[in-house]
Amino acid sequence: MLIKLRYPLSLCFIGLLFEASLSYAQAALDSRAAETMPTFTISFDSDILDVAQDGRLLLLLATHDEQEPRFLVNTSAQTQLIFGLNVQKWAAGSELAIDKNAVGFPLKDLSAVTPGTYYVQALLNRYKDYNLSNGITVSLPPDQGEGQRWNRKPGNLYSTPVKIEIKENAANNFSISLDQVIPEIEAPIDSKYIKHITMRSELLSEFWGEDVILGAHVLLPEGFDENPDAQYPLMVFHGHFPADFGGFRTTPPDPTLEPSYSARFDLEGYNIIEQQEAYDLYQAWSGEGFPRFIAIEIQHPTPYYDDSYAVNSASQGPYGDALTYELIPYIEEQFRGIGEGWSRFTYGGSTGGWEAMAVQTFYPDEYNGAFIACPDPIDFRAYLTVNIYDDSNGYFYDSQFQTLPRPGHRDYLGNVHASQYDVNRLEAALGDKGRSGQQYDIWEATFSPMGDDGYPQRLWDKETGVIDKNVAQYWRDNYDLMHIIKRDWATLGPKLEGKLHIYAGDMDNYYLNNAVYLAEDFLEGTSNPYYGGVIEYGDRAEHCWNGDHENSNAISRLRYNTMYLPRIMERIKQSAPEGADLTSWRY
């Protein structure tokens, strides 16, 4: 008994000594980290900007100078460092310190930065006040024609990158001057085939308390001027902010173009492939026998993202109504569109895929078919890897004893490259209150109710991932497309019959195929009516597979404007009402 007793006593004593030594060691590490932790003092001169600023001040550190640090932050394993904090009424000549209080990614804060050589840069993503029609004022980053890209936004201030040395056990204090301003973006130029239009939206201007301009790039059919009596069907290509109408050129690839490598597709000379595909589109578009359509790409950026998701929302306003009832009729009036629901079709991939399905669902009589590629989650039971109704946390699987991170990005072999937490942590560094301009924040800006402060309510806590079930319920009732379709099938089904064409790769990088499986389970079981559409999968295909079983994503992503035309023409043949104009545009 005595022998048995001695060992526990000895182990207890050793344990106490071990805990004490660990505490001492941790304190020593914390002390050294505090001594080594860099601080950065940021300022700008009045000759750069003479008005006090609100916004998000970003500090960027990179271990190499292959590009400026502002272009090296992402969720890949190669990402460099970013730290962000809010500034208010920051005046020229005054100094602001970025220290441990700044939110970091992928490191938590500046105290985790290790000694070494870095290239440092600072950038101010400027905000402005919006006095909303409900009486609330919000401070947000306005789009400046760049599609909510903080590192390229005209008017944002930034510093010239500087090489620094962070030393161990030294006072690492650095001063940075925001000495550059991102210049304005030149507007695209009209050509014979492509026109660029803008219009003031009455609906959105009322919501935002100031003028809101919508835009579109319009690809006109061959023979538009020579056939003044022709009226045309419309194809709406939904997607991210387009600087111009993409993938169309009237000349062969530039013979002097230096081939560039695409890391995404592991292809050398992908820029030449893009130019060839764009020229091929022109040749088909202008060739004999090709259906004469108007095709458009829409510009509808918001202060939250590069596009509005094309639906009405509490925090962004009535974009769905503005696009469907203001912009599209305006385009059809300007360019002789037929202007009837049977003659309008919509398509797109990823964000554009969700938008195509959403506008077809919410405005079923205004469109005659949606071609929905790799859509953002169309069933929130598969919000990527989260069931927002049954799961309790967006970052970790529910487990009593384990901490199992939810994946956020994979390759076609299933290798995980980023977690849900990683992606959201980057957003937290870029901005709070949904102001990062990134993916999860725009989903909340679109799907969530507005909070009392005027900003979107969080689906989950940005730090912990804990899901707010009240917000999840709001998402389900208003934006879960498959929940809405199932709920309203008796009345909605007849209006969607034959109109839904859904495509996804079964190894989509963002697990978006999971929601498509759930959609298929319901749609294939429908009756009175049977949905009568298409659901197809690409074997081992990543994001964003769009239904092409013959070519890789690298090629098929460049062919949206032609690949669905056979099915569109068949749909018109089947569904055009008696007396519809089926001839003036067939020349």
Feature locations, PLM:
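N-terminal hydrophobic targeting signals that begin at the initiator methionine
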Residues: 1-2, 569
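Bacterial N-terminal signal peptides that target proteins for export
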Residues: 2-11
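Bacterial N-terminal signal peptides
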Residues: 10-20
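Boundary at the C-terminal end of the N-terminal hydrophobic targeting segment
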Residues: 25-27
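Compositionally biased, proline/threonine/alanine/serine-rich low-complexity intrinsically disordered stretches
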Residues: 29-31
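Contiguous beta-strand segments within globular domains
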Residues: 33-44, 50-57, 213-217
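Non-catalytic cap/lid and distal C-terminal segments of serine-dependent acyl enzymes
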Residues: 63-104, 109-587
